[in-house]
Amino acid sequence: MSKKRLHEIAKEIGKSSKEVVEHAKYLGLDVKSHASSVEEADAKKIISSFSKASKPDVTASQTVKPKEVAQPSVTVVKETGSEHVEKTQVSKPKSRNFKAEREARAKEQAARKQANGSSHRSQERRGGYRQPNNHQTNEQGDKRITHRSQGDTNDKRIERKASNVSPRHDNHQLVGDRNRSFAKENHKNGRFTNQKKQGRQEPQSKSPKIDFKARAAALKAEQNAEYSRQSETRFRAQQEAKRLAELARQEAKEAALKAQAEEMSHREAALKSIEEAETKLKSSNISAKSTADNRRKKQARPEKNRELTHHSQEGQKKNKKSWNSQNQVRNQKNSNWNKNKKTKKGKNVKNTNTAPKPVTERKFHELPKEFEYTEGMTVAEIAKRIKREPAEIVKKLFMMGVMATQNQSLDGDTIELLMVDYGIEAKAKVEVDDADIERFFEDENYLNPENIVERAPVVTIMGHVDHGKTTLLDTLRNSRVATGEAGGITQHIGAYQIEEAGKKITFLDTPGHAAFTSMRARGASVTDITILIVAADDGVMPQTIEAINHSKAAGVPIIVAINKIDKPGANPERVIAELAEYGIISTAWGGECEFVEISAKFNKNIDELLETVLLVAEVEELKADPTVRAIGTVIEARLDKGKGAIATLLVQQGTLHVQDPIVVGNTFGRVRAMVNDLGRRVKSAEPSTPVSITGLNETPMAGDHFAVYADEKAARAAGEERSKRALLKQRQNTQRVSLDNLFDTLKAGEIKTVNVIIKADVQGSVEALAASLVKIEVEGVRVNVVHSAVGAINESDVTLAEASNAVIIGFNVRPTPQARQQADTDDVEIRLHSIIYKVIEEVEEAMKGKLDPVYQEKILGEAIIRETFKVSKVGTIGGFMVINGKVTRDSSVRVIRDSVVIFDGKLASLKHYKDDVKEVGNAQEGGLMIENFNDLKVDDTIEAYIMEEIVRK
């Protein structure tokens, strides 16, 4: 049902909004202003009431046509004595809405009660249910008044009415019963009699006229009075709130002024105390300085002045006697006065006639010329160092704008400014980090130039796979270890020392495979000379170029050994030309690199190669100091089951002894035993000597530096500190999610991982294998090295593999019987290898198997929505026609509107006429519903598609 606002009703009937609002309130409607809304029935009621109020009064003589109301058929009989006159029977009206009428009358009666009082309301209620409108008269009302005027009793009239009521309208009869009972009660109580006695007029044949203007004016006056009372109450409340707020502000202001005054008094007291301390300090400094000057003058006085002083003192003795007598009399008087003052009413008073203690003069300390400070020194520490009072320094800092206490730490800049104010040169103290062993390799000032001697050169042999590096080293050592290498590849770095022409040469053998790039780089960092071995029949290969780059980066000279010249296809000139392209130019061509043609297999020109090495070493002037504590580099490290951690070290400076406390990388320990390259125990190792040691608490990393410390306590502290720093650095390197890398992190979450555990015989192989596996590039899959270590595969590795769903890869190691049994029980896979590129190929195949299938979108067809049908509790059904291809039940669909995709989802149903079908072909019509989408519109395009799997190549 629609609603109307009061100002619209006022405009419609030509009245002011104010009058309409007051009239609506009078009718009992809940309105507040001209913007209030009322129901359409209430609006009609307001309009009709205005129209009735505007009609002229109808006199008693005028005949007014009664308003047709829905009443039952009633025959009214007028009685005059014994005479019965029958009036015209009222025609049967239409059915009435009694409930609405009752509600309207109730509202009207409430308004009348408020305006005229309860007595008039009772009179209106006696008008009965049959009056549809109190502003009009009806024939039935006239009859009731006639009955009362003729003196009929109320009981007879009620009985007559009851006999004429039609039994068809039960509700009407009930209302009549209520009216009759109300009339009887009034008659018994004598209310009608009282009304007549009080001179009230009998009700007329028509309803009394209501003066709406008077009632509205009275209501408005009452509202104005109520509003004035409320306004006065609000005004008083506001005045009281303002008064309380003003009091609160005054109290807060007084408290602030009081606090400010206290703060100013404290500040003045502090400044006064500082000034007093400063004046005392100045006076003490002046007195101390004058005392010192007088002392120096007395000491510098010659003997003649001393004699004159002696004579003058003898001449003054006579005058002193008279002064002494006067002083004795004065002292006697003072003593008598003190005696009289001591005794008070028999009380014992302590004797205070003791001599005052002499005041010790404060010593004057000169400021130092230099001040060495550390970050975070306190004011008290600085005052103690420069021999000044902390209060003085606090005051200076206060004048500089720095608020500090004597226990507060100061930064370096503040300390320097303070020293400038005192005129002292400030220097920051350089703290030596005992845990930093890298400083020994960067700064050689700790070496003694008098003890520096010539040392053996460290030579690294580099080259491509199977170009003869190990064969050359085997020939140099007269050993055949090269034949035992799997696949023709050296598995770890070895260090060997030979003697030629009374001089020693240390050789490092680096692997030739690309996987050992980091190991070769580590070898180049400790070497003095590089022997680049190139096969005469193969020429320059990729690993040869890498070896050249590592040697150039290390800044070491290169000696080229062209091997396999005994083969029929050997072409040394081609090798020389190819190396020239990479900056390795022979001395025969005007370059700086020495070229030697050899045959490692047949021991040809090996002596010439060694002589070339010694010649280059002599040119390089390799020196070392064997008297200092030893430092060097870890060549290789491994874990032995019986001996523990074993590290192969190359001593670079100093001499390493057994029982030396040592720090190796992030580990520490004491050298228990030392073994040289021949397997013999030695007690010391000089510079350029490779040895294997035991006694470390953990296995170090290949390439770590080592240093010998003064005692085991210092070594332990340095090792633990380095371990903590390494752990902290590892945590800091952990990538955290930020706005910049958030997308990459989310993308990485979709990548599959292959977890592996690596166990190898030596540390270098572990690092090389882990680096090679991580570099394998398979889109969508990566290798995650869960754990890598040196040693055999044990039960802990199997347990870790089971927990992390990893594969164990053993390189040149075997599992223990217990580990193999546990792996069979827990279904853990163990792969054993001795050739590195076999491991890489196997892991790459496993990574490809981890990939999810790749899908490609295939368009099936298109359809146009011709009509839409909305079904309650079901959704929107789209009637469509296929214009291209087909639409299948299991396909996905896109809803395209104005060339923009607005939804992408699955079909909920597909029908052809009334039948469920699996597909609808081209030029056919059907109906469809889309899951979770009901916003289909005519002319929308439906694109059907499926995702097909693509076979990986």
Curated annotation (Swiss-Prot):
Residues 322-338 have a biased composition (Low complexity). The keyword Nucleotide-binding applies. Residues 339-348 have a biased composition (Basic residues). GTP binds at residues 463-470, 509-513, 563-566. It holds the Pfam family EF-G_D2. The lineage of its organism: Bacteria, Bacillati, Bacillota, Bacilli, Lactobacillales. Residues 599-601 are annotated as: G5. This is Translation initiation factor IF-2. Its main location: cytoplasm. Residues 463-470 are annotated as: G1. Belongs to the TRAFAC class translation factor GTPase superfamily. Classic translation factor GTPase family. IF-2 subfamily.
